[in-house]
């Protein structure tokens, strides 16, 4: 699998608010997947944001490996999967990061303001694409 930096066409696909699925590792070792929002930061890391009470935050603290598959909304056959590791977990005290994600995906700030949120930054170790994102 290729390693970063991402080619321009792959970076462009990941920059869109595409549907995505995040994979974590349950404490008993089995994979757990969930739909999620994400943003690619200027430094190439992936920003995720979680409700602080969610089990996947515990999964990430115990096993910092993450996979994320972003599916091109216009053609689900075209997708990019990244595998990486959590390099930072921080409280999203003022809900700045979840608002950024919510605006990216829906155009408005995140409506739920009374629950603690946590931001997770993932550094990409390697990636692969399929469909129009496939690299030979």
Positions of PLM-derived features:
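Charged, gly/pro-rich active-site loop segments
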Residues: 1-5, 77-136
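Extreme N-terminal tail/first-helix region
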Residues: 1-17
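Non-catalytic surface loops within mature trypsin-like serine protease
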Residues: 42, 52, 72, 88, ...
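Short beta-strand segments
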Residues: 17-52, 66-70, 81
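A short beta-turn/loop motif at secondary-structure boundaries
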Residues: 28-30, 72-76, 114
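Short, surface-exposed beta-strand-loop junctions and turns on beta-sheet-rich folds
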Residues: 54-56, 75, 136
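Residues at secondary-structure transition points
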Residues: 4-8, 51, 55, 113
